């Protein structure tokens, strides 16, 4: 199962709202909702998040058994 809990923690640590991230990387509300539900998104989106936040993928995504 994919978890984006680390992404939400990273945003909190940086005092950033989800909508700010959405606007900065240019994703749709539907994609933001998928992230919120823990649904799979395109790896390019994950890459763009990592580039924008200047962090590693381990700060964004976690695979839970």
Question: Model-flagged regions — what are they?
Answer:
Residues 1-18:
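A short, Lys/Arg-rich alpha-helix, primarily the initiator
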Residues 26-41:
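Recognition helix of helix-turn-helix/homeodomain-like DNA-binding domains
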Residues 20, 31, 59:
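Residues in the helix-turn-helix
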Residues 54-65:
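Short C-terminal boundary/hinge segments that cap the last helix of small helical domains
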Residues 38-51:
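Short, basic-rich loop-to-helix N-cap that marks the start of a DNA-contacting helix
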Residues 11, 22, 50:
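The alpha-helix within a helix-turn-helix
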